[in-house]
A protein has these predicted regions:
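N-terminal secretory targeting modules
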Residues: 1-41, 210-222
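Sec-exported extracytoplasmic/periplasmic mature domains
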Residues: 20, 54, 109, 131-138, ...
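Conserved SGNH/GDSL esterase-like catalytic core that processes O-acyl groups on lipids
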Residues: 25, 30-124, 148-160, 187, ...
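Glycoside hydrolase catalytic-domain groove-lining segments
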Residues: 117-142
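Extracytoplasmic/secreted envelope proteins and their assembly/folding machinery
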Residues: 46, 50, 127-130, 201, ...
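Catalytic His-Asp segment of secreted/periplasmic serine-dependent ester chemistry enzymes
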Residues: 148-222
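Surface-exposed acidic, glycine-flexible loop patches that form ligand/cofactor-binding
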Residues: 3-5, 90-100, 131-137, 211-215
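Structural recognition of the beta-strand scaffold that forms the well-ordered cores
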Residues: 11-15, 20, 57-61, 102-107, ...
Length: 222
C-alpha cells in the first residue's frame, strides 16, 4: 500500500494569468465567448504537470493580470503587487516560511504586451519580480514559462531571465510555441484549449524532470 506519506514531498507553485486559471479550455473554438462553465483549472498545463509528478501544488493566478499591466492597460493590481500579500482585500504580508516550493513556475507576460507595456519596461519589471521571489524562496528553482499565447515579448523575457540567471543559476526559461497559428488548439477568446494545455504540459514536464531528476509517480491529489 502506498500513500502520500510514502514519498518525499514534492512542491510546485504556479504564478500566472488566465492560462493557469484554465480560461476557456473546455470551449469548442475561439469564436466562443468566455463562460465559467468552460474554465476548468483541473485540466490546465499546471494541473497536468502537478499530477504527473504527484506534487503538492499551489496556484496563484488571476485572469488578465501581468507584471506591470493588465490586459486593458490598468496598472492598479499587477501580480507583483499582490503576490507577496495574504489577499487582494487583506494586504498583510504573507508568511512564506509556511510553505516553500521546490519549483516555482512563472507564466506571465501576455497581458503586459496587450496592455501596452514596452519590452524594456517589462524586462525591468520581470527582473525585479524574480529577485523578490528569490528573496522569499531562497532554495527554489524559478522557471519562467512563456509563449503559449503570445510570442512578441520573447526578447524581453529572455533578457530578464538571462540577467537574473547570471547571478542565480537556479533561474531558467521555457519557451512554448504559440497556439495562434493552430486554430485546433484554441478555446474561448483565443485561449489554449485542452490540446494546447496537454502540449504545454509535456514541454513543462520534460523541463522540470531535467532540472530536478523527478520521475513520474502516482498522484494523490485530484
Amino acid at each position: 500500500m502506498t500513500g502520500p506519506d510514502s514519498f518525499p514531498c514534492r512542491r510546485l507553485e504556479f504564478i500566472g494569468d488566465s492560462m493557469t486559471c484554465g480560461f476557456g479550455n473546455l470551449s469548442a473554438g475561439p469564436q466562443e465567448p468566455f463562460s465559467p462553465t468552460t474554465e476548468d483549472s483541473t485540466q490546465t498545463y499546471a494541473a497536468l504537470t502537478s499530477r504527473h509528478f504527484g506534487a503538492d501544488t499551489r496556484y496563484l493566478c488571476r485572469s488578465g493580470r501581468g507584471i506591470i499591466s493588465d490586459c486593458e492597460g490598468s496598472r492598479a493590481q499587477p501580480v507583483p503587487r499582490w503576490f507577496f500579500e495574504t489577499s487582494l482585500t487583506h494586504p498583510q504580508p504573507w508568511d512564506f516560511s509556511s510553505w516553500q516550493p521546490d519549483v516555482a513556475v512563472i507564466n506571465l507576460g501576455t497581458n503586459d504586451r496587450n496592455g501596452g507595456v514596452s519590452q524594456e519596461e517589462f524586462t525591468a519589471g520581470a527582473v525585479a519580480f524574480l529577485r523578490r521571489i528569490r528573496g522569499v524562496y531562497p532554495n527554489a528553482r524559478l522557471l519562467w514559462m512563456y509563449g503559449l499565447m503570445d510570442e512578441d515579448f520573447i526578447p524581453a523575457v529572455k533578457e530578464a531571465v538571462e540577467t537574473v540567471r547570471a547571478e542565480d543559476p537556479l533561474v531558467d526559461l521555457l519557451l512554448v510555441p504559440s497556439i495562434y497559428p493552430h486554430p485546433e488548439e484554441q478555446g474561448a477568446c483565443n485561449h489554449p484549449n485542452l490540446a494546447a494545455h496537454a502540449r504545454a504540459a509535456r514541454a513543462l514536464i520534460t523541463k522540470i524532470a531535467k532540472q530536478t531528476g523527478w520521475a513520474a509517480r502516482p498522484s494523490f491529489w485530484p
